[in-house]
């Protein structure tokens, strides 16, 4: 179905690459050195698809990072474009502050020292 790889010179300097995606891209892919990558918009839509189903901490973490570049409305718009028959905007706004499933999930190693409690508060402030 898919595969994960850690790419880098050693354990402390690496990134995780997941190859799990089989759906057609809705947003144009990005091509770097003849390698096709999903766009940020595509990734954001995928993250909201997971959040719509309960979400994991890493998905909230990733969306929180995307909020440095995009608005919450932008990110929800990417999801709706990708999933026109999926969750509504109001349903997503409810899910983006429902941390019940993610609460028991492992806490990602954050290289920016972000805190889970602050991330939750930021989402709650955005949805108010």
Roles of regions detected by a PLM:
Residues 1-128:
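Compositionally biased terminal segments of proteins
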